[in-house]
Curated annotation (Swiss-Prot):
PANTHER family: 39S RIBOSOMAL PROTEIN L10, MITOCHONDRIAL. GO terms for cellular component: ribonucleoprotein complex; ribosome. Part of the ribosomal stalk of the 50S ribosomal subunit. The N-terminus interacts with L11 and the large rRNA to form the base of the stalk. The C-terminus forms an elongated spine to which L12 dimers bind in a sequential fashion forming a multimeric L10(L12)X complex. Keywords: Ribonucleoprotein, Ribosomal protein, RNA-binding, rRNA-binding. It comes from Synechococcus sp. (strain RCC307). This is Large ribosomal subunit protein uL10. The gene is rplJ. Belongs to the universal ribosomal protein uL10 family.
Amino acid sequence: MGRTLENKQQIVEELKQLLGEAEMALVLDYKGLSIKEMSDLRGRLAANGICKVTKNTLMRRAIDGNDTWSDLDPLLTGTNAFVLVKGDVGGAVKAVQSFQKDSKKSELKGGLFEGRLLSQNDIKAIGDLPSKEGLMAQIAGSINAVATKLAVGVNEVPSGLARALQQHADSENS
């Protein structure tokens, strides 16, 4: 039995709400994936987003008139699962890439981030970036290194002067 018009409208509204909260959308060809594998993907994405399987026509209606997501339209062909990411974009991309590596069945068609259509290479580059916490640790380490070098440099001036005076005094005594 097909879906009723009211049911379809409800799905479109839910998609619009999810897209409103999302920062990134990935389009994944899920052909050949079992229910267990889809559940695995959803579990991996739980912290950073959701995986939604819906008809392309319903997604097309959800993005219609929305400038942020309208560029997704060319990707809406075939059997698609939509990964809607909020929060840690890099973490979600890494979760999808890890899932693809493990399942070897799905293909990432592309995605959309900040109104820009992403190719597979763009998505791979995002996945290769360190996490937000990793970047913050690198920045903190760099700032700490500068402070340490400054402290050593400031401390070295009087020490160097003292060594030079001591050397001069030793040479005078000899």
